[in-house]
């Protein structure tokens, strides 16, 4: 997969699908997940509907630049945040969501794309929101999927989902792949597919196993704060999609996002958790195609 320099110290790995002459759609993935989490079949199906689809690895993930020179001790970081020692927490994390948003926009620049439709899932939704807030002239439309506003009162995880998210991941391939089945904790209750979760985990492990980046991405997310006031002023056409089965980011996160952004459309999806089950792809793709028309 190709990679391009988006700044003096960051290169981003990406893959594109479809005709470059079609309207560009940038897919932004979430916390700790590689571009593979935007399934290739999903990307091709969206491209077949007349969109030029670009997926990419965020910094500190996949084949993009790693920040090994800034190790984060998760225990110390969580203790600092929990105790309110934000100066100490801030000093541990080398970047914020704004930097991750700049990476995505830098990728578009490197590809010669001035403006694009931006679709972000989970933390990727937060990054996509930040793109639209920081450079609205470059974002044709925003689709914020299974995400939230950065306000602590909305989009909270259930204790069960949080326990799975922060459980230590096995370092060996077999253990890592087996543990992925536990992500059913936040998946669609109807369509949750442990085999598909393990298949993605195996592909991700083989491509670029890199647990060290998770702490820095978490820090960027936690320390970037609330976007609520800024979202009230956003004028980019916005679609908010959230699964009603989501226990990792409660649907209140999506509802709140749509409440804040003037004119935003809210699509609450039954039988969808913090995932994109293949059975729901037609509905999700229809929604994105309609919003980006």
Roles of regions detected by a PLM:
Residues 114-153:
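Conserved hydrolase catalytic core segment
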Residues 234, 240-242:
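Short beta-strand/loop motif that positions the catalytic acidic residue
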